[in-house]
Amino acid sequence: MRKHLFPVLLLANTLWSCLFAQTPIVMDMVHHNPGEPFTNTWFNEPGNLVQYGFNAQVVNEFQSVHTAITYSSLDPRICPAGSKERLWIDSVATRIENKIEAIHKAGLEAYYFTDIIVLPKRLVEIYKNEICDATGRIDFTRPKTQEIHRIMLQEIFKRFPKLDGLVIRVGETYLQNTPYHTGNGPIPRNEKSWEHNSAYKTDGGEKIHSNLINLLREEVCIRQNKKIFYRTWDFRSEERRVGKECKIGRAHV
């Protein structure tokens, strides 16, 4: 009996691995310059990407899905109906919906490039004492900040249920295309230099990255069954900034 057990276990392991094997995702992303007119390129068209073997498109206009939600489940004062902020948000949301539809029509998966942290200015005004440090910087380590990001992710996929996932960037935060939002990177650093301020960033950023990745996995991969791609160059290694890129993927539960 024992001699037959290993082949059975091997077969079971192979079948289990095949069950959860993921098809490679070949993404195209036109990186528009923040604050400038959008790049006019043939590669903006989803149908053209299929000809080159892409199976996913990442939209990066620096007006991402987290700038196109109202946070109404948190506080209706943040983006009241009829306000200039609401009109802008609704306009961006409509454009995003149309882009997702066009991407799917071409047979591609749709992702949005998303900087962390970017929040409505009004939200930061209301919750400043709970989410900002003494310098006015939004502090990701604070419980309220993390709670707000969970609400943000929930509202994103409620507003855009057909979105396949997010490409998260940590390291730079561009606000030129978001007149009603503000933000900063979650990893504290010396703002006068790309080099990290070790006296301020006591854990090297690893703990904040870990907490953020786990939050994203729970809210996006597990709760929504969507994908996350996590991009960052905000680690300190041998006294220089280095880049990291990983796929959290879709959780199997």
Whereabouts are the PLM-identified features?
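Bacterial Sec-dependent N-terminal signal peptides
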Residues: M1-Q22
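Aromatic-lined carbohydrate-binding surfaces of glycoside hydrolases
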Residues: Q22-R250
